Amino acid sequence: MGRPGMDSSEGRESNGVVPERNGGAVPAKQQLDGKDTLRYANILRSRNKFAEALQLYNNVLEKDEANVEALIGKGICLQAQSLPMQAIECFNEAVRIDPGNACALTYCGMIYKDEGHLVEAAEAYQKARNADPSYKPAAEFLAIVLTDLGTSLKLAGNTEEGIQKYCEALEVDSHYAPAYYNLGVVYSEMMQFDLALTCYEKAALERPLYAEAYCNMGVIYKNRGELEAAIACYERCLTISPNFEIAKNNMAIALTDLGTKVKIEGDINQGVAYYKKALFYNWHYADAMYNLGVAYGEMLNFEMAIVFYELALHFNPRCAEACNNLGVIYKDRDNLDKAVECYQMALSIKPNFSQSLNNLGVVYTVQGKMDAASSMIQKAIFANSTYAEAYNNLGVLYRDAGSITSAVQAYEKCLQIDPDSRNAGQNRLLALNYIDEGFDDKLYQAHREWGKRFLKLYPQYTSWDNPKVADRPLVIGYVSPDYFTHSVSYFIEAPLAHHDYSNYKVVVYSGVVKADAKTLRFKDKVLKKGGLWRDIYGIDEKKVASLVREDKVDILVELTGHTANNKLGTMACRPAPIQVTWIGYPNTTGLPTIDYRITDSLADPPDTTQKHVEELVRLPESFLCYSPSPEAGPVCPTPAILNGFITFGSFNNLAKITPKVLQVWAKILCAVPNSRLVVKCKPFCCDSIRQKFLSTLAELGLEPLRVDLLPLIHLNHDHMQAYSLMDISLDTFPYAGTTTTCESLYMGVPCVTMAGSVHAHNVGVSLLTKVGLGRLVAKSENEYVSLALDLAADVTALQELRMSLRGLMAKSPVCDGENFTRGLESAYRNMWRRYCDGDAPALRRLDLLQEEPCSNNNKQDFDDNQVAKLADLKAQRVDAAVDGDKQSQLTAHAAVVGEVQQAPIMVNGVSSPVSSGKVEANGHISR
């Protein structure tokens, strides 16, 4: 009887009847009468009129009980009427009369086979072949039953014996396709894929419409990674059998993997097309939906990414990776509660999912929940002890908590595991700026060695088409991720607004992760003045370098340094003839391709001993120009008038508030009776951080009841108004405040700062001097204390200064955007003229590097393993914009099916799992 999916009845009569052979001789008269009756019976039987035919066969046998042909015909009718035992009696009788009757023997075999007696069936077919080797039906049916025997043996665990039976079947009938097919199945299970493929190909050659063979050929090609060949096999299969569900599912898998392959090779649009085609074959295939989410995330189409991640979860509620990646998208959109919900859902599916544990720690770090963050990141490390970026994020957490030594150790642990971690390498450089003085040369060497290694990861342009005409209009490019409500934005606004665009055309390269109203205002201003605005978030740094060259930028200015989302990889390519670093980082970048670093004579005095890779260019006044927030609100009276006591304060981050700073502050507070200290910092929403801070001050003699600790304030207006809580602002050292100092002064709060030997220490010196408060710049810790005490001693003078300070600041060079920009343009013009005269500091520097012999000692002081090969890594922000702190680079991770890549969007989709739908047909095909 026929078996589903295995039909090899070609060459047999349509009613399944085996041609009979004539029986023994009969008397002439009987033979004539019987022959007519027998012929009519055969006609009735061929028309499926078995009852009528049976009656005629009986009539013949009543007259001639030895008529073999009638016995065979009767047996066939009985078999058709589901009377196998009576039928086999007829066939056996025919064999008794004519032992060499191949037809009767073959029908005996058919009944044995239908009754499940395969061995007896095979013996009957073999006897038929022996009786008449030319009788083809016997050979064909023997091949069938041998194939069935082979399958039975294989299923019983006797694989070798099963293979032997398949081979015997092919010896009997070398054209029997199911035997080849089932051999292919066995060899596939034995992982002998070359043999399996040969067998499937022979099966398809013998039976061109063998859908299952094409399907399983596709599985082998798919598992070998030959996706195009696999897809071609599945297409052939589905042409034969359009509703073959296993083949459709396999096609969806192969197309999904091909989509990932071409996406990784750089053709993301074709990858998306393959993912969508996969859904045509299997509309509920969650892996294709997941990878579409990944692709749309990489294309920055986050709305579509969300749609497909949610679809993936609908069809596969256990897809923890989709939950994780949704969380990353919501995190980047500042929807932290939703992000936490997604990460927690991922962890409910995979409790030890290190990426989601890490990402939850990232969110808690951003929120200042340091204990919870530490717990999550430590769990991520426990789940995966080689998870390098978790150590990077632990370093960021320690840095935010003010534990710089622990932060550096965590970064170095990350670099031990992954020497290529760009985030940890750069975060380490940033953290070293918080360490006390006496470290300057080692800090310089750390930056310099990082820059030399980083440079090797990028090809450098060595020629430019920019015309060397000294006084022609210039194109100035500004590259930054901080064109939103962020500390850098308060200092870049003046040039964007006041540049003479006819002579200094501005091209903005904006890497903003999430644009806000300030972003849109900047963009509108630049475009209306005739500039160009390019959004480069998510674009590879080498591609950004190509854009810079296309835009014919003459001077490219980077505003980020080693803080989050920087484009130092673009600067390493040297796409512009002149390259500059400014504002975003308080030290050298260490990158040899950057010509100049913009500063002033107060932040970096001419006699400074601090070393820089770049050549210093000092602006005529301050190197900073502050554009106050329109949301600041009015200046309030100094609170001491109503309070009756002085309140000192600082809104700098904890990393800047070193133990030495706390010692000096405690000395001031202890010297001013009833005075209070207010400190605002993100981690102060964490009880353990608060208690540690208060305990430290208590050890220094300052009662905790005199200290107010405020957590992060999200709204900019409320943040600015919080300055009304303090009478006097205390700056930090050796890493002084920048935005916080400007905000303090703008809100009428005088700030006491201290000069030092490095730029980071002297930013407050520059700001206060240019505002007209040079008298508040101390040269020592003792003088710092004295200046603070002098201010606190005269509340009336403090009030007068407070109410006049905003006006004083507005008239100072620090807020004079027009004149500041003219000075900046003059500096740019001088740089350009030097270039036209053949003087480019970076080119000289690069030539010298080419001449340096290679050192065998890769371990420089404080620069172990700072290789940054992942040059297109981007990092999460740490601090809120209004705090004005430099941001370390947090790395959140997206998990993928099969692979994880480090990237800020956390949407790293690659190959989907293999679920090869192998079809195993067992050769039961007789009827």
Curated annotation (Swiss-Prot):
UniProt keyword list: Gibberellin signaling pathway, Glycosyltransferase, Nucleus, Repeat, TPR repeat, Transferase
GO MF terms, alphabetically ordered: peptide-O-fucosyltransferase activity; protein O-acetylglucosaminyltransferase activity
Disulfides per UniProt: none
Pathway(s) served: Protein modification; protein glycosylation
Region (Disordered): 1-31
Catalytic activity, EC: 2.4.1.255
Keyword Transferase: yes
Chain intervals for the UniProt region annotation (Catalytic region): 422-927
Lineage top rank: taxon: Eukaryota
Principal location listed in the UniProt entry: nucleus
UniProt TPR repeat ranges: 34-67, 68-101, 102-135, 143-176, 177-210, 211-244, 252-285, 286-319, 320-353, 355-387, 388-421
One Pfam short name: Glyco_transf_41
Locations listed in the record: Nucleus
A single GO BP: negative regulation of gibberellic acid mediated signaling pathway
Reaction equations catalysed: L-seryl-[protein] + UDP-N-acetyl-alpha-D-glucosamine = 3-O-(N-acetyl-beta-D-glucosaminyl)-L-seryl-[protein] + UDP + H(+); L-threonyl-[protein] + UDP-N-acetyl-alpha-D-glucosamine = 3-O-(N-acetyl-beta-D-glucosaminyl)-L-threonyl-[protein] + UDP + H(+)
A Gene Ontology term for the protein's cellular component: nucleus
Family: Belongs to the glycosyltransferase 41 family. O-GlcNAc transferase subfamily.
Function, in words: Probable O-linked N-acetylglucosamine transferase (OGT) involved in various processes such as gibberellin (GA) signaling pathway. OGTs catalyze the addition of nucleotide-activated sugars directly onto the polypeptide through O-glycosidic linkage with the hydroxyl of serine or threonine. Probably acts by adding O-linked sugars to yet unknown proteins.
Name of the protein this chain belongs to: Probable UDP-N-acetylglucosamine--peptide N-acetylglucosaminyltransferase SPINDLY
Taxonomic source organism: Oryza sativa subsp. japonica
